Amino acid sequence: MIAILTDKPNVGKEIARILGAQTRENGYMTGNGYMVTWTFGNMLSLAMPKDYGIERPEREAFPLNPAPFKLMVKHVKTDTGWVPDINAVLQLKVIEKVFAACDTIIAATDASREGEMVFRYLYQYLDCHKPYRRLWISSLTDEAVLEGMANLKAGSLFNQMFLAADSRNKADWLLGLNASYAICQTTGTGNNSLGRVQTPVLAAIS
């Protein structure tokens, strides 16, 4: 059995249709030797300081520089604070089940740095060690999918693409968290936020 992972439900269902995986299950499609499942975009993110045992960073804690970085399930804000996204939690369990039931994996996430990061983060988070290959397509036509499946790429060919996305993500974390906590320490207020993108944009329009 071969697992296929996409980063959108509609993409997964379309690929499943093309490959003849027509049986619908909870969170995946199966049939013709395939189990096709999906994420809801990026369901994982870099962990927050409290996940490293730092509840309220003091001056001596700076700079925050985790080694290694940890991953966590995406959180959503509620009336009682930030909690794990239940949809992400449930779908991660489905993906783990699908991966466990298959011998090999095809990464069919978006053909981009972000798409590569979605798969690699999930692969790391689940501590998966099964062999995988990459489906690299820019169209969901039957012809494009079938051609891509006939010409699957070695996952290692996209290592540099993942490293680029991962480095950008970690740089955003380092800049955003350190700068935001630092300004909160300086001003004595807790509602300040700085970041690689938002700060120059706000400066440009102010």
Go through each PLM region and give its residues.
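Intrinsically disordered, low-complexity regulatory segments
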Residues: 1-169, 173-175, 200
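Prokaryote-biased recognition of long, low-complexity C-terminal linker/tail segments
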Residues: 6, 168, 172-206
